[in-house]
Swiss-Prot record:
Name of the encoding gene: ispH
Amino acids binding (2E)-4-hydroxy-3-methylbut-2-enyl diphosphate: H43, H81, H131, T170, S226, N228, S271
Family of the protein in this entry: Belongs to the IspH family.
Top-level taxon in the UniProt lineage: Bacteria
Organism, scientific name: Bacillus velezensis (strain DSM 23117 / BGSC 10A6 / LMG 26770 / FZB42)
Protein name: 4-hydroxy-3-methylbut-2-enyl diphosphate reductase
InterPro entries, A to Z: LytB/IspH
Amino acid sequence: MDVIKISPRGYCYGVVDAMVIAKNASLDKTLPRPIYILGMIVHNKHVTDAFEEDGIYTLDGTNRLEILKQVEKGTVIFTAHGVSPEVRKAAEEKGLVTIDATCPDVTKTHDLIRKVKAEGYHVIYIGKKGHPEPEGAVGVAPEIVHLVETEEDVRNLDIQAEKLIVTNQTTMSQWDVHDIMESVKEKYPYVEYHQEICLATQVRQEAVSEQAKKADLTIVVGDPKSNNSNRLAQVSEEIAGTKAYRIGDISELKLEWLKDVNTVAVTAGASTPTPITKEVIRFLEQFDHNDESTWQLEHSVPLKKILPKVKIKN
């Protein structure tokens, strides 16, 4: 089968930095144990499973404050998605050692919210409800940040502030953000724009929007909790016009999807381990509709291949 390996795809620098920070923590014998990650360090189960094998435990829950209640001692790592000041304060009051793996692009948004709050603004924040990144951003200044996910949410807003700015979650589809921002502008003509789609997300979406047009099908390799992975599938269908499926790894691929498909495009979310994506590409490249021996779907990437290698400091 012909395979279009969409480029760029896969890991972004924020994800790599977060994983290196956590990997170094696992090697640091001076850190108090146990070591916990407050939520998924990045949204990929293969990554969290690999860290657990290294003795770093991922805690899950409805929000970061609730998750923190599970921790009585040791070290906590804040994920790439960022946390609110309230979570940081709660960890400090518990006497926990904290390690911050927040993506620099997320930190920029937090800094923006602090800045405009001091200047008397309210903020309309476009993001996915229930996702940890908006949770952290709204938590920076909950009294002035208004979370919206849809154009209907915008219509339901009742903001009286004279100074208003609109910004967004870094991993949203830039086309969705544009449409919602237009709705905001229609309701609040004086609003100021500050789009925060991170560059890695933007170029990956643009690559899919162009390169997937040449394929009969797009496969996005990414975790179901990964917002940017889900958005890539959306971009393939809505912008490139190519049917798309998101899979966590090769074991989730369905052979019936490949019926009547001659060319398949493959991309991966920003938190998807490269070996997982390569395994999918290898399968598709050798797949032959007429040869059943090429139809075996087997995930075989060991966990030790998932995490980045780091140098041990002497």
